[in-house]
Amino acid sequence: MAFLSLSSGDVTGFKVLFALLILYGLVSYLVHSVIHMKFIAPLGVNAPLDRFSEARAIEHVRVLAEQIGGRQEGSPGLRQAAVYIRTQLEQIKERAGSNIRIEIEETVVNGSFNMMFLGQSISLTYRNHTNILMRISSVDSQDSDPSVLLNGHFDTPPGSPGAASLLELARLTIDSGWTPPRPIIFLFNGAEELFMLYYGLQDDGLGSHGFMTTNRWRDTIGAFINVEASGTGGFDLVCQSGPGSWPSYTYSQSAVYPMATSAAQDVFGAIPGDTDYRMFANDYGDIPGLDIIFLLGGYFYHTSSDTVERLLPGSMQARGDNLFSLMKAFASSTKLLTAQQRESFGAAASGSKGESPVFFDYFAQFLVCRYLGLLLKKASPGVSQYSICDISPYASFIVLEKWEFILYL
């Protein structure tokens, strides 16, 4: 009988291979846990009122998706959803303290605009679209103060995590006892996906166009967060940011569960789809902001299988915690400016538009955020130790051997 004979080199090779397999398994498990939000415990309906609760947000989803059902433009369900959202906002207003001013508006918008789709220019005209707004501010604030906009649309097919997240977030803004240093505007727009229903992936953004062309607060918006969903949950990815570097930097400093990569912004440009981000940041506002989107489970997106039960546990909890922290960071920032102020200050208002932000998260634990611009200069003699240090909120440097690399944010 012949026996397999292994040399010492073969044994070492097998050990290395076995170690690599274990490492691969651990990394795969970690990545799967992060993508599916396994490390986040969603809070229930009885959670403290000063915390965002996924269970409370899902209650809104069930009303919108199951009790009301289809909410396509022109359907009775869309009007029922508007009534429900307005009712919830009025209830939130009743609980506000004496130091808070709340204004609720329901507006009907009309308009027209051109858009590019698959290389072709298309003209769209719309009438009688409903937008619902809630503006939360301190009693001593002015109408002209720069504000933060959070946008979500409620005209989706079954499932509406965007609008539901904002309802719970509006409640949290009041019940947390926080007094916003700058006004916060929640926009529930009722016409974002009309064009997509007929032509595939492209979204048209009629409601956001109506806001940007007619609303009295449009020129006060200093930053915005657009909440979207192209799936049933998972990591809440920042797929677009800008103009300038300020939005991505603010996200890197404030997100509780940072989930972002600058590569997503490059890929998104190649997809025949769009969001309300275009109306705010590019076509009509030039407003600094973020486009945040659910991606996992995209094969259920806009199908009959896009149900409440398919929402991944922990996804909306992570979204709510991130949005509340990010909203407070934007509202407290000195870079929050009105349209007139941005025009006066130019590129310095939110970071140069020529800057190219490069960022990525590390398993949703922290975000590495840097901006292109490299200066190389000679270090002092005798410096040989490798070190990484922060010298300002906008720069970091690496000292390696006798060369000092300064990477400007």
Residue ranges and their predicted role:
Residues 1-6, 353-365, 392-395:
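Membrane-proximal N-terminal segments immediately preceding the first transmembrane helix
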Residues 2, 14, 19, 190, ...:
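Short amphipathic alpha-helical "recognition" segments used for binding
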Residues 2-4, 21-30, 381-409:
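Alpha-helical transmembrane segments of integral membrane proteins
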Residues 5-44:
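Hydrophobic alpha-helical transmembrane signal-anchor segments
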Residues 9-15, 361-384:
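Juxtamembrane/start-of-transmembrane alpha-helix segments at the extracytoplasmic/lumenal side
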Residues 12, 77, 398-399:
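Alpha-helix capping and helix-coil boundary motifs
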Residues 42-371:
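Soluble extramembrane regions of membrane proteins in the secretory/endomembrane system
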